[in-house]
Each structure stands twice: as C-alpha cells, then as structure tokens.
C-alpha cells in the first residue's frame, strides 16, 4: 500500500537531482567573462580603471565568447596563420599584436569580402590597396596575396604610427583612415583613442582587437577548450616565380602536378576569370603549391 508513495518520492528526488545538474551546466555555459585588472595593446596601457572602458571591453568579450562557430574557426585558423603573419610584422618592425587586426578584419580568411568590397586577410578597399602598391585587375587581386598585403599593411601602420605616435590610434586609423582619426583628435582636443567620440564601428574596433587577443591567448579561460591537434597546421609550399601570362591555368596546374582547384585555393590572388592569367609586363609573381611529401 505504501509503494506508490515511495516510488513518487524517488521519482521526485531523481527529477530534482537532474534539474540541479542541468542548472549547474547552464550556469557554467553562461558565465560572465573575466576582465583582467591590467591590459596593454602594443605596450600601451588600456585604462580599465575607467568604468566605461571596462564595460566596452566586457561587451566585446561577451559577444565573441558566444559567437561559438566563428570563434572556434578563428582559433583553428590561427594555427595556420599566426606565426607566419607575426613573423612578417616583426620583420617590418610592427608590433606582433597587430595580428589580431587581421583576426577581426577577415577572421583569417584570405578570400573573405566585406559589404563595402574590402577583401583579403587585412580587408583592404580597392582605392587604399592601389595607394599602397597592390595590383588589382581582371586577373590579379593582390589584396588576397598574404605576403604582399601584409607588407602593404605594415607600411600603412608604420606611417600612421609616425603621424600619431600611438599604436592604439594607429589601429583605429586602419579602420577609419588617418584623416578621419586626425580630424577627430583635433576637433575634440584630445590625444587618446579612449576619449574620442567616434562612429560605432571605429569606437568598437580596438575593443574587438583586445577581446580576441584575450580569448586567443587563453581560450580555455573563455570556454574554448582546444587541444594542439585541433588547430589547422601551416602549409609548406614550393614557390614558382612567373613573369609571363598563362593562357591555360588548368593545364599549367597539371604541369605542376596539382589540380586547378589546388592552384586556386593556395593562390587566391588569381582572379577567377576564363581560366587564364594575364600579367603586368616586367613584373614577377609567386605561384605557391603545397610541397610534395617525402
């Protein structure tokens, strides 16, 4: 006669037990990000003692902590790109932390394109790209050449730093333009990015860089537990120098022992037009194909 009551009590206890662990699990998943007490960008302190600055950083951390698919892919792609891009920046005497600028611009996708038409790892617009010596034609788009676009980016950053004397303002200028930042500084009578009233995109820009820097330097702290084998590995390349146009790219690819798809994938600067490549006379270009395994 007492069994149904006992069974009910056991069932109720079991449900409470399950709900407790479900609640604990949800709480763990939606925990707020840890904000460091001190933070720098390229050696320049971020004024986190200002509640507004701390809040702006926290917002970007919350956004990027919860963009699960894109943040995981960024982390995985960093295994392929981080060392390469940081080495190029370092050789140009640009702080390695500007790697995170490429992260927020393109999510480390060399063929990504913004709604404004910017493309490549660093998302150059066409006019700026040409100003910094990158070729864009029906057949070539050097914004999608990792080496050449990183060199162009380094030139821009060094010029901007020479003008502003601040790497933080230099980062903002990459988004807003040097003239835009210069006008804002003069108009608002300040020398600090953190004191500027700016358009929303530029106002968030450095904070997005800082948020991705924090997450990527310690993914586990922000809920992303990747093992070393989860990261995409750098590709080892053989390089072929060319200075003449190619009339049949699939045939050319086959002569190199690769498919046209492989040629295009590893040379995204080649525009997808009628299977040929018309080059500027007297200029040398690099074709990269994956190195053959021994």
Kindly give the residue locations of the regions a language model identified:
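An acidic, Gly/Ser/Thr/Pro-rich helix-cap/linker signature
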Residues: 2-3, 7-9, 20-93
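Solvent-exposed, acidic/flexible segments
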Residues: 67, 71-82, 91-94, 114-122, ...
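Short, functionally critical alpha-helical segments immediately adjacent to catalytic or ligand/cofactor-binding
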Residues: 94-111, 170-176, 213, 263-266
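Substrate-binding/active-site groove segments that recognize
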Residues: 116-138, 150-152, 157, 181-184
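Catalytic and binding regions of secreted/periplasmic enzymes and modules that target cell-wall glycans
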Residues: 157-184
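Catalytic cores of secreted or luminal carbohydrate-active enzymes
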Residues: 200-223
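Primarily a LysM-type cell-wall glycan-binding module
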Residues: 228-257
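Extracellular LysM carbohydrate-binding repeats and other cell-envelope/extracellular binding modules
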Residues: 266-294
């Amino acid at each position: 006669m007492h069994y149904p009551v006992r069974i009910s009590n056991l069932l109720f206890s079991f449900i409470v037990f399950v709900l407790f662990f479900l609640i604990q699990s949800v709480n763990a998943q939606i925990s707020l990000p840890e904000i460091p007490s001190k933070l720098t960008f390229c050696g320049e302190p971020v004024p986190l003692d200002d509640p507004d600055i701390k809040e702006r950083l926290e917002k970007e951390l919350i956004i990027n902590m919860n963009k699960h698919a894109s943040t995981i892919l960024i982390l995985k792609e960093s295994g392929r790109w981080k060392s390469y891009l940081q080495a190029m920046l370092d050789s140009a005497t640009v702080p390695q932390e500007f790697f995170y600028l490429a992260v927020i611009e393109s999510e480390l996708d060399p063929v990504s394109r913004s709604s404004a038409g910017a493309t490549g790892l660093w998302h150059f617009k066409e006019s700026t790209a040409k100003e910094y010596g990158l070729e864009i034609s029906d057949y070539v788009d050097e914004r999608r050449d990792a080496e050449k676009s990183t060199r162009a980016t380094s030139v821009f950053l060094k010029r901007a730093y020479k003008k502003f004397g601040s790497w933080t303002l230099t980062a903002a200028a990459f988004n807003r333009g040097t003239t835009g930042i210069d006008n804002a500084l003069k108009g608002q009578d300040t020398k600090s990015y953190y004191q500027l009233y700016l358009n929303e995109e530029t106002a968030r820009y450095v904070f997005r860089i800082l948020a991705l820097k924090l997450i990527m330097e310690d993914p586990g702290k922000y809920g992303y537990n990747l093992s070393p084998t989860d990261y995409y590995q750098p590709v080892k390349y053989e390089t072929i120098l060319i200075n003449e146009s190619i009339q049949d790219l699939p045939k050319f690819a086959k002569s190199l022992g690769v498919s046209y798809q492989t040629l295009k994938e590893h040379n995204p600067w080649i525009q997808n037009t009628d299977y040929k490549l018309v080059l500027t006379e007297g200029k040398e270009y690099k074709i990269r194909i994956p190195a053959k395994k021994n």
